């Protein structure tokens, strides 16, 4: 008797599993609230050099700015430069300082802002950019905060993956909640930029526990038949978190209070641990038979299955322990031991890198649109659910490979088309970004389904772990790619679209899994590859 047989006895899908899905909804909603938090927390409002002695009379302020600030090519005042010598404004006297005496002949001399900046506070009362002046020459420091956060997620995923196998999913979920709460509070209370970057990076490592632990806690209590459906349902909670972030961001305009609001839900999460079941499969692999039996009986009772303690005899449970321990624990090296597994792994790594790079590149940069940041975030969240529904129908009709390649190609084309559209046509830019968001979200959803079906059962979790690591690498580099606009304004879009195009072509190299029986062993993968070559 294997564990699947035990699960069949106590119920592989019922009220017990549904309660578990609801309990796991909180960490799934917390993730996008933190992952996408820089959209609000690190936003850069309109700004210009601080000009001491500005007139109190509002009617004179534009003239004062005209005298002190150069204009950009689009007619707006410069955000990063000021005149070395104030320029004389015809027919207006703004004070004794407004004079060009001492300035050399020729073009007016400009210098960087030396006394700080003044910010437009109409949309945000404070962000990390306004608090620590992360603008102009320091704008790279603003982007680095997101990169460090995702590097923390990457490192944390490796650590939590090891620790959860050693100490259990439930215990490490509690650690993730507590550490995310403590580090989130410390981030909100940061007294300087360095403290913020360090605590934010550690927060990313703590939150990585949710990405690693939640899925096994769900899947290891579900029968095979309902795992895909439950997986799709659980992704809806991510979209819910995106929408919730838009609402919370609109209501809270200070980055410290916003970060606090995104962190405090960890408190009910800590309380919910009381009802979260440990993975009975993991308990059996550790030889903790009595604890596993307690959870299995609880599952049977809640699911209405007439299973007594005699049905889960000590002998039957010990047999499962023997079988589970006999299974060889896979490593990342196993993903490259055969030619077909190497092919699948390398292609999936590129696809996941491209999916994450384009998704976060698009999601974290909402500038230049015809909507404010709150409307944009709300629209981004609203478009995710239709994207998931679209994927459901496309993978059934076109298959996984063509759907994945098509969605990535669609994202690449929207980036490419935006290069041809004038930046002044805000409505067209907004429409293209929303369409690109839909394609990138659909590519994300398809990637989870496609990858899980490509790997054999014995390597499925390991394969997903490797590809997810590459995805997080793409997510960490996406904010830095936005800095390429210093070389050429449109270069970030070229980078995002180019990587998406390469990932789309790579997806076409993967085998189709539509209506195919899921491989159980490495031999199944190699056998299927041989059969396809013969055909």
From Swiss-Prot:
InterPro entries in UniProt: MFS_dom, MFS_sugar_transport-like, MFS_trans_sf, Orgcat_transp/SVOP
Transmembrane region(s): 21-41, 144-164, 178-198, 202-222, 232-252, 257-277, 344-364, 375-395, 402-422, 429-449, 464-484, 489-509
Record-level Gene Ontology MF annotations: alpha-ketoglutarate transmembrane transporter activity; organic anion transmembrane transporter activity; prostaglandin transmembrane transporter activity; sodium-independent organic anion transmembrane transporter activity; transmembrane transporter activity
Coiled coil: none
Reaction equation(s) it catalyzes: orotate(out) + L-glutamate(in) = orotate(in) + L-glutamate(out); 3',5'-cyclic GMP(in) = 3',5'-cyclic GMP(out); GMP(in) = GMP(out); 2'-deoxyguanosine(in) = 2'-deoxyguanosine(out)
Tissue: Expressed in liver and kidney. Expressed at low levels in adipose tissue. Expressed in fetal liver. In kidney, expressed at the brush border of the proximal tubule S3 segment (S3) in the outer stripe and medullary rays. In kidney, expression is higher in female than male.
Record's keyword terms, sorted: Cell membrane, Ion transport, Membrane, Transmembrane, Transmembrane helix, Transport
Membrane-topology descriptor: Multi-pass membrane protein
Superkingdom classification of source: Eukaryota
Location(s), subcellular: Basolateral cell membrane; Apical cell membrane; Cell membrane
Any GO BP: organic anion transport
GO cellular component terms, A-Z: apical plasma membrane; basal plasma membrane; basolateral plasma membrane; plasma membrane
Induction per the UniProt record: Strongly inhibited by androgen, and weakly stimulated by estrogen and progesterone, which results in gender differences (female > male) that appears in puberty, for expression in kidney.
Described purpose of this protein according to its UniProt entry: Functions as a Na(+)-independent bidirectional multispecific transporter. Contributes to the renal and hepatic elimination of endogenous organic compounds from the systemic circulation into the urine and bile, respectively. Capable of transporting a wide range of purine and pyrimidine nucleobases, nucleosides, and nucleotides with cGMP, 2'deoxyguanosine and GMP being the preferred substrates.
Additional comment: Involved in the uptake of clinically used drugs such as ketoprofen, indomethacin and methotrexate, and contributes to renal and hepatic drug elimination.
Recorded family membership: Belongs to the major facilitator (TC 2.A.1) superfamily. Organic cation transporter (TC 2.A.1.19) family.
Protein name: Solute carrier family 22 member 7
Lineage: Eukaryota, Metazoa, Chordata, Craniata, Vertebrata
Gene field: Slc22a7
């Amino acid at each position: 008797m294997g564990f699947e047989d035990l699960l069949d006895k106590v119920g592989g899908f019922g009220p017990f599993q549904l309660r578990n899905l609801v309990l796991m909804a909180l960490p799934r909603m917390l993730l996008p609230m933190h992952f996408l938090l820089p959209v609000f927390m690190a936003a850069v409002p309109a700004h210009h050099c601080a000009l001491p002695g500005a007139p109190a009379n509002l009617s004179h302020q534009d003239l004062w700015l005209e005298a002190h600030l150069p204009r950009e090519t689009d007619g707006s005042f410069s955000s990063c430069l000021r005149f070395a010598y104030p320029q004389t404004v015809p027919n207006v006297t703004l004070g004794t300082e407004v004079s060009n005496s001492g300035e050399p002949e020729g073009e007016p001399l400009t210098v960087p802002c030396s006394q700080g900046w003044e910010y437009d506070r109409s949309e945000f009362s404070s962000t990390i950019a306004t608090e620590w002046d992360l603008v102009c020459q320091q704008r790279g420091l603003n982007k680095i905060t997101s990169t460090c956060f995702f590097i923390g997620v990457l490192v944390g995923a490796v650590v939590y993956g090891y620790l959860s196998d050693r100490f259990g999913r439930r215990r490490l979920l509690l650690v993730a909640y507590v550490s995310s709460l403590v580090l989130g509070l410390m981030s909100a209370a940061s007294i300087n930029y360095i403290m913020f970057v360090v605590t934010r990076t550690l927060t990313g490592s703590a939150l990585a526990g949710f990405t690693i632990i939640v899925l096994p806690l769900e899947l290891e209590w579900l029968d095979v038949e309902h795992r895909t459906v439950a997986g799709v349902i659980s992704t809806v909670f991510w979209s819910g978190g995106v929408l919730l972030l838009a609402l919370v961001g609109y209501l809270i305009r200070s980055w410290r209070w916003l970060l606090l609001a995104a962190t405090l839900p960890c408190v009910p999460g800590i309380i919910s641990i009381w009802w979260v079941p440990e993975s009975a499969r993991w308990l059996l692999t550790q030889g903790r038979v009595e604890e596993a039996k307690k959870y299995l009986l609880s599952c049977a009772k809640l699911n209405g299955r007439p299973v007594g303690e005699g049905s889960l005899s000590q002998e039957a449970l010990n047999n499962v322990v023997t079988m589970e321990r006999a299974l060889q624990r896979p490593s990342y090296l196993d993903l490259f031991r055969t030619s077909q597994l190497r092919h699948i792994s390398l292609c999936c790594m590129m696809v996941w890198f491209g999916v994450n790079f384009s998704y976060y590149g698009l999601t974290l940069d909402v500038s230049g649109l015809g909507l404010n940041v709150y409307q944009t975030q709300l629209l981004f969240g609203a478009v995710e659910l239709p994207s998931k529904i679209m994927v459901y129908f496309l993978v059934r009709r076109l298959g996984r490979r063509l759907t994945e390649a098509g969605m990535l190609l669609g994202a690449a084309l929207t980036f490419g088309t935006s290069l041809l559209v004038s930046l002044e046509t805000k409505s067209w830019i907004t429409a293209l970004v929303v369409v690109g968001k839909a394609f990138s979200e659909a590519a994300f959803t398809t990637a989870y389904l496609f990858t899980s079906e490509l790997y054999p059962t014995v390597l499925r979790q390991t394969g997903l772990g490797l590809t997810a690591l590459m995805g997080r690498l793409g997510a960490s580099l996406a904010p830095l790619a936005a800095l390429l606009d210093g070389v050429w304004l449109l270069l970030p879009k070229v980078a995002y679209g180019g990587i998406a195009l390469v990932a789309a072509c790579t997806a076409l190299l993967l085998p189709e899994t539509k209506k195919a029986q899921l491989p159980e062993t490495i031999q199944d993968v190699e056998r299927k590859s041989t059969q396809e070559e013969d055909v």
